[in-house]
A protein has these predicted regions:
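The conserved SAM/SAH-binding core of class I Rossmann-like methyltransferase domains
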Residues: 22, 130-132, 197
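Adenosine-phosphate binding glycine-rich loop
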Residues: 195, 199-264
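NAD(P)-binding Rossmann-fold cofactor-contacting core
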Residues: 124-147
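Residues at the starts of beta-strands that form the adenosine-phosphate
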Residues: 18, 102-103, 125-128, 150, ...
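Glycine-rich adenosine-cofactor-binding loop
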Residues: 86-89, 96-121, 131-136
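Rossmann-like adenosine-cofactor binding region
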Residues: 147-220
Length: 264
């Protein structure tokens, strides 16, 4: 997704930059990756799972979002040092706004969920976390405790039962990438003041977002998140102000094509 989004924009800006995809498989020499990032022809790098926590630790300086979440999705080269940012936190903050949540139910406990938890700091009275991997849930609970957030782990079924009374539902899993998937919380109706935040982006409208639309609820989907995530990079990289508009136009064109499916 990132080369498709950024390269048309960079060509229009005529600043001499290009966006390349690097495949960094699990088990690769991360010291070699870090050394490559410090080469003088590198401006910055987006980092995807499963390397977001590595990126936070590999940086010389970090933002508050990285320090709090323990994850980074953007490394910027500043001379011979790396500066870590978490634009997932920025995107969730922008899209969620200043809502106060009485109860947030989060499906998934990976990097996207960590960013969401940081963005909700001070704005959620209670959080329920459900993940197929108990260890991932445990790690997210530790983060919640460090932030002073009242959180509990639940089984998938328990979280689905709690969802109808929640004010925020977060899908930080791949559920929805298939057009045959159900909403992440099941088929139940949600509270009239609920918001649905779905990290999945796809050519089709995901089941979770379709249900939110049918119920007249506020929502943010994976395309919204991609837009805000990219917009957050613009000032960090010192790019021209018109970059944001170019990104939005390019993302709109990609959304209208068969751009595949993904989760941030």
């Amino acid at each position: 997704m990132s080369p498709e989004l950024w390269n048309p924009v960079l060509r229009q800006l005529t600043i001499g930059w290009s966006y390349e995809a690097w495949d960094v498989p699990t088990g690769a020499s991360m010291s070699a990756v870090r050394a490559k990032l410090l080469q003088t022809d590198v401006v910055a790098a987006n980092v995807t799972m499963p390397h977001k926590q590595w990126a936070a630790g590999a940086a010389d300086t970090v933002t508050d979002g990285v320090r709090l979440s323990g994850a980074a999705n953007l490394l910027v080269r500043r001379d011979k040092q790396l500066e870590a940012h978490n634009t997932d936190v920025s995107a969730v903050t922008a899209l969620h706004g200043d809502r106060a949540e009485r109860h947030a139910v989060m499906f998934g406990a990976g990097g996207a969920a960590r960013a969401t938890l940081v963005a909700l700091n001070g704005r959620a009275a209670r959080v329920t976390i459900a993940d197929r991997d108990p260890e991932a849930s445990s790690q997210l609970l530790e983060l919640a405790a460090s932030l002073g957030i009242d959180a509990m782990a639940a089984t998938w079924d328990e979280a689905q039962r709690q969802a109808p009374e929640a004010s925020l539902i977060v899908n930080a899993t791949p559920l929805g990438k298939s057009c045959h998937d159900e909403p992440v919380w099941g088929k139940a109706g949600l509270a009239e003041d609920a918001m649905v935040y779905d990290f999945v982006y796809a050519k089709h409208v995901t089941a979770s977002i379709a249900s939110a639309q049918e119920q007249g609820l506020r929502y943010a989907d994976g395309w919204d998140h991609l837009r805000e995530q990219a917009a957050a990079m613009v000032p960090v990289l010192g790019m021209p102000p018109r970059t944001g508009l170019l990104l939005e136009r390019t993302l709109g064109m990609i959304h209208g094509e068969d751009a595949g499916v993904g989760i941030i």
